[in-house]
């Protein structure tokens, strides 16, 4: 069942209730796809920016995309020259890791720096710090022991700063709620009600002290990890957002003001761990006045900087491999499409920051780049007859039977064929079983959804919301962007786990839904200008005569908010039989692709925020 009914509802209020109630009943896309189609304004890649129809070299009249040129070429490797691959830096990093482990171990009742009045917040602080700095992978055992200790003192009113604190503390409770929930502990958001007055407002002082502002920062961060139906989390988000925005207008520029700005900018569902680490490095510990605490922050900061820069030496090797693949595959002959392989690799590097996940990073970049070319081929360049031939050949999966295809399609067929087979071999090595047929079916479903949309474009058909949305979740590309790359990781995905993170799981369905819905809100105007009418917005308006564009946008945004809460629950449900660590990779793919729509369609206009992301997380080292 799609989010919006195709039957016009009596009022906006009724429609909103219908949308909310259907969030947890989203029907996974069936492999049997109807014979209609449409444009992909909601995918994370956008179709043509031009309505021009020049005659190509083969004498066929074709549209062109009008995209800006590729921002990166082979010269990008020169910018990745870094000395941090030398053994001396790694050895220094290992020593710092041991010192930080000692910091974890020193937080005990016997340590003079801590007391029963502050030990809980100190424990939460160090866990939160290593996670935001992107170095937590070294301290999994220490983090688990620390959070077990904090959780053992958790109450229905939250926690105080220490185990002997008389009253609960907002900062400790908010940070504890967020951190414990992200690690799968069963903690209720109801604890926040104890910090509200009779009017539902969170208590705060007129003076707006630094300590209070940090408490509200953590309240805001906690509110983003809301589950469905948690009204107090919605109230916390509204209050903390208003409070922090107003505080930014009053306080002087400082590391605190920069941190507040970064936190407001980095919402949970577009937050990229490597970008968060890069931003947090710039503000971490700058205002620390306590000498002993300063020494701790300096060690954490040095390790974070080393880890960030050392990773760049690995990125250089991987990017060199990706550029060779791009050139050897003949992508430079494909002139009708965008080329975003560097941008996609950057996104992969921002979510899979552990060095051992090289195959994931490269596989994700390759899959997404192929998706982009196919998108432009189906939306812009290919004729309907050519596209039907290509779709049929994908189902045959036989490279010897492609003589019927035009030259450019033969090239794309072989690129897709070789890539899927290569990643299947890598997945077999990682998983110990053959997954080729599974991957082929995913790609067939995806290509079918593209073909369906191409037919909608060709016939001028505007589908109902249900028709559009069910097909659109598949054509969002989320599944094929995630499936094979995660299977190449050295993480076991047995069948019972895989079915809970891939099709037809609710996790996959919600992640695809968010990408479709958010993409449509960013791209529908450009699509309409190109003559591609169908989108969540236009289909909603068709199903609900009298609804304005603003009504549709408001409604879709409300639905996105609720779908996000549903995705939070699917990821973090403490009663789930699937480990968070298995689900998080699919969730992170959703975050990465969602990031491209954070400000605009960053996949068609990639020379602003997307370019900045490449510069900040791939090309620029952190200064010491």
UniProtKB/Swiss-Prot annotation:
Residues 1-48 form a transit peptide. Its cofactor is Mg(2+); Mn(2+). InterPro entries: Isoprenoid_synthase_dom_sf (IPR008949), Terpene_cyclase-like_1_C (IPR034741), Terpene_cyclase_plant_C1 (IPR044814), Terpene_synth_N (IPR001906), Terpene_synth_N_sf (IPR036965), Terpene_synthase-like (IPR050148), Terpene_synthase_metal-bd (IPR005630), Terpenoid_cyclase/PrenylTrfase (IPR008930). Pathway: Terpene metabolism; oleoresin biosynthesis. Keywords: Chloroplast, Lyase, Magnesium, Metal-binding, Plastid, Transit peptide. Mg(2+) 1 binds at residues 375, 379. Mg(2+) 3 binds at residue 527. A motif (DDXXD motif) lies at residues 375-379. Mg(2+) 2 binds at residues 375, 379. It is an enzyme of class 4 (lyase). It catalyses: (2E)-geranyl diphosphate = (-)-beta-phellandrene + diphosphate. The keyword Transit peptide applies. It is found in: Plastid, Chloroplast. Its EC number is 4.2.3.52. SUPFAM superfamilies: Terpenoid cyclases/Protein prenyltransferases, Terpenoid synthases. Binds 3 Mg(2+) or Mn(2+) ions per subunit. One of its GO terms (cellular component) is chloroplast. The Asp-Asp-Xaa-Xaa-Asp/Glu (DDXXD/E) motif is important for the catalytic activity, presumably through binding to Mg(2+). Terpene synthase (TPS) involved in the biosynthesis of monoterpene natural products included in conifer oleoresin secretions and volatile emissions; these compounds contribute to biotic and abiotic stress defense against herbivores and pathogens. Catalyzes the conversion of (2E)-geranyl diphosphate (GPP) to (-)-beta-phellandrene. Belongs to the terpene synthase family. Tpsd subfamily. This is (-)-beta-phellandrene synthase 3, chloroplastic. It comes from Picea sitchensis (Sitka spruce).
């Amino acid at each position: 069942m799609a989010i919006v009914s195709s039957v016009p509802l009596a009022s906006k209020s009724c429609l909103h209730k219908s949308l909310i109630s259907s969030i947890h009943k989203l029907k996974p896309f069936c492999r049997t796809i109807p014979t209609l189609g449409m444009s992909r304004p909601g995918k994370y890649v956008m179709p043509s920016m031009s309505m021009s129809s020049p005659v190509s070299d083969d004498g066929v009249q074709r549209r062109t995309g009008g995209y800006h040129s590729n921002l990166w070429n082979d010269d990008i490797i020169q910018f990745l020259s870094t000395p941090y691959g030398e053994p001396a830096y790694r050895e220094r990093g290992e020593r710092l890791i041991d010192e930080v482990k000692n910091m974890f171990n020193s937080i005990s009742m016997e340590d003079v720096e801590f007391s029963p009045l502050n030990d809980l917040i100190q424990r939460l602080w160090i866990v939160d710090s290593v996670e935001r700095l992107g170095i937590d992978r070294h301290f999994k055992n220490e983090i688990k022991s620390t959070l077990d200790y904090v959780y053992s003192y958790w109450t229905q009113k939250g926690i105080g700063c220490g185990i002997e604190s008389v009253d609960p503390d907002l900062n400790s409770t908010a940070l504890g709620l967020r951190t414990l929930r992200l690690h799968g502990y069963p903690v209720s958001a109801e604890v926040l009600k104890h910090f509200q007055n009779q009017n539902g407002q969170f208590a705060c002082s007129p003076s707006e002290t630094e300590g209070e502002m940090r408490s509200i920062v953590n309240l805001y961060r906690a509110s983003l990890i809301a589950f469905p139906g948690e009204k107090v989390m919605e109230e916390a988000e509204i209050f903390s957002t208003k409070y922090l925005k107003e505080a930014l207008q009053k306080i002087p520029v400082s590391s605190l003001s920069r941190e507040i700005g970064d936190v407001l900018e980095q919402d949970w569902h577009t937050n990229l761990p490597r970008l968060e680490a890069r931003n947090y490095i710039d503000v971490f510990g700058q205002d620390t006045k306590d000498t002993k605490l300063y020494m701790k922050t300096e060690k954490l900061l040095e390790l974070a900087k080393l880890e960030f820069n050392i990773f760049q030496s690995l990125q250089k090797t991987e990017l060199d491999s990706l550029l060779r693949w791009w050139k050897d595959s003949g992508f430079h002959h494909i002139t009708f499409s965008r080329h975003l392989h560097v941008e996609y690799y950057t996104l992969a590097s921002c979510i899979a920051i552990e060095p051992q996940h090289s195959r994931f990073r490269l596989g994700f970049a390759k899959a997404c780049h192929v998706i982009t070319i196919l998108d432009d081929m189906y939306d812009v360049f290919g004729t309907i007859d050519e596209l039907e031939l290509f779709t049929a050949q994908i189902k045959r999966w036989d490279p010897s039977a492609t003589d019927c295809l035009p030259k450019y399609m033969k090239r794309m067929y072989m690129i897709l064929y070789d890539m899927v087979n290569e990643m299947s071999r890598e997945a077999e090595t990682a998983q110990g079983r053959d997954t080729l047929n599974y991957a082929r079916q995913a790609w067939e479903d995806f290509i079918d959804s593209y073909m369906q949309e191409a037919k909608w474009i060709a016939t001028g058909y505007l589908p109902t919301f249900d028709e559009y949305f069910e097909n659109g979740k598949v054509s969002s590309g989320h599944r094929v962007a995630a499936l094979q790359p995660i299977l190449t990781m050295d993480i076991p995905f047995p069948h019972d786990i895989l079915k809970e993170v891939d099709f037809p799981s609710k996790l996959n369905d919600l992640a695809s839904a968010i990408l479709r819905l958010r993409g449509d809100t960013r791209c529908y105007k450009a699509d309409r200008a190109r003559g591609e009418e169908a989108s969540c917005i236009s289909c909603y308006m068709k199903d609900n005569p009298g609804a304005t564009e603003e009504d549709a946008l408001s409604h879709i945004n409300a639905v996105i908010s609720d779908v996000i809460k549903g995705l939070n629950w699917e990821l973090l449900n403490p009663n789930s039989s699937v480990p968070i660590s298995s689900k998080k990779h699919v969730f992170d793919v959703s975050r990465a692709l969602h990031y491209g729509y954070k400000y605009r369609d960053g996949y068609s206009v990639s020379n602003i925020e997307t370019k900045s992301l490449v510069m900040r997380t791939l090309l620029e080292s952190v200064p010491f």
